[in-house]
């Protein structure tokens, strides 16, 4: 009996491997003028070259050898990595409609309600409508300013905590995450929900499994792998918990009047738009829940990640820290509150934030997918191909940046570059149709808290640590978060 079972398993595996090899051979016969890439292994393609490395690092190494448009075969998935300003501009501007899709993964499909959101939604009427609502109604510059009292209130809470912990080691990773989460909770829901900490953890776990590197994502034709995907059951458990939390939030908003607790929050706006007769594509409850999860995913993870990288780089570069603090303390002296308009004059601090995002982009590999066959840099890119723009690699390319491995904010004084999507070697928020619609909101949630952290406190590393001892490693996942928590010692600054 055991022999029969073993034989059946061997036959099943052999059949699976043979079918994949035949499929890859047939595909290779029809491929012409495709981007260059490293030699492939049967079945796995180039997956072995990513082993033990972060994908953006491994793909940067490939680009050095094979060029800025590199073919990377991820199992069955034909992928192209773009690592130059010119190729990125071609894909994200000149060919933007053709390259405007997102590739789907098991993680995004389960956690983001069949990709019924904005971040992972395919390019469609639904996506265009939700993005328009987001830009004009939810996260416009006017609305970002209207959330100023929330930022100030939550920042005051953090400052009080740091003041009471002066001279002690503080886990800034935890504190900044709490701050950002609280701001987003109040902007989205009108109040801090009871389950906000659990929701943040669910977001982190979801993003770590949303990068498209699950085996079932890399071999999509295999029903067996899809069935046996060991993370699938975990994802569904997480989805059920997320749905319980979001359903409660939605139900509570249905019962209350819009603005009952002081102003229209993001969910109030979505409910209002849901009833608008001008809406062409119906806004479902699942679409609202997916958008809420988007807000947490993009808002908490990227804003807190950038703030922590800024603080880490300032601790590694004391001269930059001193210059930034001098500017902030001169400009904000005597002010009782700080918000978006106040930080506009902090030119050097803004350069510090830019330099941080150059070296540590919130999304190191921006994912796209082809909606039709197209040509980039003279190479054929097949329909449905996965495209990854290596933002991390371009931010450290000596062709575009002098001393790219040096943290040097002054470089932005010499060359005018911004992250609004027109300088394609520097696109931490993306570019083209899919540029981040929450750019202004996210930036405000970095710059306003940062200015106050630099104004009110002097900072030291935990006892016994030197700047050269700091671990600046990145963690795995869709976002470029720090691998280890940032531990700092605040000392209250007293203005002379």
Swiss-Prot record:
Cofactors demanded by this protein: heme
Gene: CYP71D95
Domain of life: Eukaryota
Membrane topology recorded in Swiss-Prot or TrEMBL: Single-pass type II membrane protein
Stretches that traverse the bilayer: 2-22
Recorded family membership: Belongs to the cytochrome P450 family.
Uppermost EC category: oxidoreductase
Location(s), subcellular: Endoplasmic reticulum membrane
Catalytic reactions on record: (4S)-limonene + reduced [NADPH--hemoprotein reductase] + O2 = (1S,6R)-isopiperitenol + oxidized [NADPH--hemoprotein reductase] + H2O + H(+)
EC number: 1.14.14.99
Chief location bin: endoplasmic reticulum
Binding site for heme: 436
GO CC annotation terms, alphabetical: endoplasmic reticulum membrane
Function, in words: Hydroxylates both (+)- and (-)-limonene to (+) and (-)-trans-isopiperitenol.
Signal peptide: none
Keywords from the UniProt entry: Endoplasmic reticulum, Heme, Iron, Membrane, Metal-binding, Monooxygenase, Oxidoreductase, Signal-anchor, Transmembrane, Transmembrane helix
PANTHER family: CYTOCHROME P450 71D8, OS08G0105600 PROTEIN
Protein name (record): Cytochrome P450 71D95
GO molecular function: (S)-limonene 3-monooxygenase activity; heme binding; iron ion binding
Entry keyword Heme: yes
PROSITE patterns associated with the record: CYTOCHROME_P450
């Amino acid at each position: 009996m055991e022999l029969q079972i073993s034989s059946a398993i061997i036959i099943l595996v052999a059949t699976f491997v043979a079918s994949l090899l035949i499929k890859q051979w047939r595909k290779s016969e029809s491929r012409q003028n495709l981007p260059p890439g490293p030699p492939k292994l049967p079945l796995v393609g180039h997956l072995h070259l990513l082993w033990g490395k972060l994908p953006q690092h491994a793909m940067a190494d490939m680009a050095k050898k094979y060029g800025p448009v590199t073919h990377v075969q991820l199992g069955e998935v034909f992928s192209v990595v773009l690592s130059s300003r010119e190729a990125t501009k071609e894909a994200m501007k000149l060919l933007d409609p053709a390259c405007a899709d997102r590739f789907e993964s098991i993680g995004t499909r389960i956690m983001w309600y069949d990709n019924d959101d904005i971040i992972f939604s395919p390019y469609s009427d639904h996506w265009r409508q939700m993005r328009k609502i987001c830009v004009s109604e939810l996260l416009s510059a006017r609305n970002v300013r209207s959330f100023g009292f929330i930022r100030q209130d939550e920042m005051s809470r953090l400052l009080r905590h740091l003041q009471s912990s002066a001279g002690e080691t503080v886990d800034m990773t935890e504190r900044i995450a709490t701050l950002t989460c609280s701001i987003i909770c109040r902007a989205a829901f009108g109040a801090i929900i009871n389950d906000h900490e659990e929701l943040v953890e669910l977001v982190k776990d979801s993003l770590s499994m949303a990068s498209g590197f699950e085996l079932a994502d890399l071999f999509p034709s295999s029903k067996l792998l899809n069935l046996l995907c060991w993370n699938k059951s975990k994802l569904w458990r997480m989805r059920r918990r997320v749905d319980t939390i979001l359903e409660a939030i939605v139900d509570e908003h249905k019962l209350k009047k819009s603005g009952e607790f002081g102003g229209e929050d993001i969910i109030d706006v979505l409910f209002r738009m849901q009833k608008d007769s001008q809406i062409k594509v119906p806004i479902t409850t699942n679409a609202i829940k997916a958008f809420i999860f988007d807000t947490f995913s993009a808002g908490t993870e990227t804003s807190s990640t950038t703030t922590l990288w800024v603080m880490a780089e300032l601790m590694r570069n004391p001269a930059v820290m001193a210059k930034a603090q001098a500017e902030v303390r001169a400009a904000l002296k005597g002010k009782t509150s700080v918000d978006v308009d106040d930080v506009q004059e902090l030119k050097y601090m803004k350069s510090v934030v830019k330099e941080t995002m150059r070296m540590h982009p919130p999304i190191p590999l921006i994912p796209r997918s082809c909606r039709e066959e197209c040509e980039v840099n003279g190479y054929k890119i097949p329909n449905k191909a996965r495209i990854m723009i290596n933002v991390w690699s371009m931010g450290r390319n000596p062709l575009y940046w002098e001393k790219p491995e040096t943290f040097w904010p002054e470089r932005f004084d010499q060359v005018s570059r911004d992250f609004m999507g027109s300088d394609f070697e520097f696109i931490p928020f993306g570019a083209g149709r899919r540029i981040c619609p929450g750019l202004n909101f996210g930036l405000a949630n970095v710059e306003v808290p940062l200015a106050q952290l630099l104004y009110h406190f002097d900072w030291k590393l935990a006892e016994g640590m030197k700047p050269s001892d700091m671990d600046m490693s990145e963690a795995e996942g869709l976002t470029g978060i720090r691998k280890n928590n940032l531990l700092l010692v605040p000392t209250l600054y007293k203005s002379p």
